[in-house]
């Protein structure tokens, strides 16, 4: 996306309607949704008309500023209480298990006591995969056998977290969308348990999405929004320039903040999302490619 935008701006000596059209097309091709691309170009037009933009070269900095303002807000995790609970949802292959392991390692490195709950009980090998990541992160895992009631796992994880004075409880939950009624009932049961056991606690419900799937990730988010009260997004397999357009669409059209981005395979490759840094990287001259995570 970055290179296409630079090429377009470099091809024009002055700002014209054709430039606006080419710019909008480049944004859409870069995984920015049509509505968001239109919003960006409309705001650029307003600033040009107001005399804030001198030439196409200057427009690049202005577009970066528009994007930064568009994606700003809500990215901080609102976890203050002890304990706080994080529920993580997402389809198979998005990087959900990997994300949970990295998140556990991140909070542990901050000096927090973390416990994990393996409540995605219906996916083959999900429990074993989370066990591997718990070992890598050096945190405790609560698990039941495959096919167990997910809500029972969450209940036992909360009990264990309270008994061990844990700061952060992270539960791996729903990983499928094919039966929305069952998923809604499962999540509702989990919510009731949290409300009963931890009525005072801060909570986040994070949806893990694979950035390489582009607009499909946005559609997936819309589907999950119908069954879960999502408070934030984790975008995995994200190279800051090639797939960054998804971030803009999620924040602008779905009004869900991106909380974390996954940029590699290592345990410390989960980063808190920083809108200003991201917007700047999106429009830098050089492109840095990050290694993708595992598909777990």
Describe the role of every protein-language-model region.
Residues 2-119, 126-171:
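Primarily NTPase-proximal linker/entry elements flanking Walker-type ATP/GTP-binding cores
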Residues 31-33, 230, 288:
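A general structural signal for well-ordered secondary-structure junctions
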Residues 34-36, 123, 239, 267:
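Short hydrophobic/aromatic residue motifs in ordered secondary structure
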Residues 89-90, 172, 208, 262:
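Short beta-strand segments
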Residues 119-122, 146, 212, 238:
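Structured loop/turn residues at secondary-structure junctions
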Residues 129, 150-164, 178-284:
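Conserved catalytic-core segment of NTP-binding enzymes
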Residues 174-176:
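Short glycine-rich anion-binding loops that position phosphate/pyrophosphate groups of nucleotides
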Residues 289-296:
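Short acidic DE-rich linear segments
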